[in-house]
Amino acid sequence: MSEEAPPEDDSYIVRVKAVVMSRDDSSGGWLPHEGGGLSRVGVSKVYPEGSGRSNFLIHGERLNDKLVLLECYLKKDLVYWKATPTFHHWLVDNRRFGLTFQSPADARAFDRGVRKAIEDLTEGSTTSSSTIHNEAELGDDDVFATSTDSSSNSSQKREPPVRTIASPLPGGHCRYSTLSNIDLPGFEHYPTEQSCARPHRHVSFPDDDDEIVRINPRERNWLTGYEDYRQAPIHRKYPDTESIDSYVRFAKSESTKHDYNYPYVDHTNFGISKDLKTSVINTQPSRCSSRRKDGERSRCIYCRDMFNHDENRRGQCQDAPDSVRNCIRRVSCMGFADCVLYHCMSDSEGDYTDACSCDTSDEKFCLRWMLLIPLSIIAPGMCCYLPLRACYNCGVMCGCCGGKHKAAG
């Protein structure tokens, strides 16, 4: 096996955090590869040695020990499954690979990145790196590697390098790497041009934009065997504020509210040392004054997408809890129909089409509806699902029903 250098940050089409999963043929399920752990997985454009055409590589590296867990070259005959909103797996050269994502938004972004790479392979496109990184084509600009990675703190911009790597294995383009611990000096750690300067007459409270890992309660029923591995430690990117000389002092008192004490210095005596404790201005900043500006966007805790507070209304978030939708499913006994379809018409991966789907391209379309007819006799409430669902869709279009985005924090 030839040892390959990891892809550069600028060569990635998409990059997310996920847990690399491997197929267990004995049990028919998926297990975390090499003991699990959160990894940084991305789709990068590479140039094989001695070939004028570019290939695309799925590269996964565990965060805690920098161990390469996944290296998979994409091919045109790749088969991709979206088993759940946070678990996707694919098949290439009779090898199966899987990823458990932290959020549905990360999963959708990775899916779009893979489809973009497959389209380029099919069309034989020689699109440059700047065209591939078009955020308008792929969306979810928070996970695409068009700028410095979120774990770094750099203000430098580098030109996308053209690299040369060894050709893939002749027996197949996909493999799980069992290399030992790889030391990558400088990888994802860029030098900082300037240190944190001491502010003058300005107080800023930086928001920690690290993604908070949350599990949708409705997804927990589907995730068995790998949902616990989505939990990941959150590392703060900012230094401890107690170690930095700041102009803000928090008064220690028994009051439940924080008093922000700003030292008042006389402009006429800047060169004279003076006890600042004798002249202090006690102010209480307005609540949520900076969170509700016109046109400000926030991240939803349910779907992890960015949304505008001014345009947020009912029906905007499909992942948000909705009491009306839950009531319709309970009244129409759709849980009973889903249970029967899962046991009778699911594939080897446990996937099945929605009970009332009208997609005629499904090979089991007629069989599914023939099964629903006797089920509606046993549970007559199922006959009410379609008219109730139609009324619900009208309510969503009018803004009367549906879930709303909720800002994180």
From Swiss-Prot:
Origin: domain of life:
Eukaryota
The beginning of the lineage is: Eukaryota, Metazoa, Chordata, Craniata, Vertebrata
Cited function: Negatively regulates Ras signaling pathways and downstream activation of MAP kinases.
Please list the residue ranges that the record marks as compositionally biased, kind Polar residues: 123-133
| Name listed for the protein in its UniProt record | Sprouty-related, EVH1 domain-containing protein 2
Q: Where is the SPR domain?
A: 299-407
Domain spans labelled WH1: 5-121
What SMART domains does this protein map onto?
Answer: WH1
Domain KBD, which positions?
199-253
Keywords of the record, alphabetical order, are: Cell membrane, Cytoplasm, Cytoplasmic vesicle, Membrane
Which residue stretches belong to region Disordered? 121-170
Localization: Cell membrane; Cytoplasmic vesicle, Secretory vesicle membrane; Cytoplasm
> Could you give a single Gene Ontology term from the biological process aspect?
regulation of signal transduction
| GO cellular component annotations of the record | plasma membrane; transport vesicle membrane
Amino acid composition bias (Low complexity), ranges on this chain: 146-155
- Pfam families assigned to the protein according to its UniProt record, in alphabetical order: Sprouty, WH1
Q: How does it sit in the membrane?
A: Peripheral membrane protein
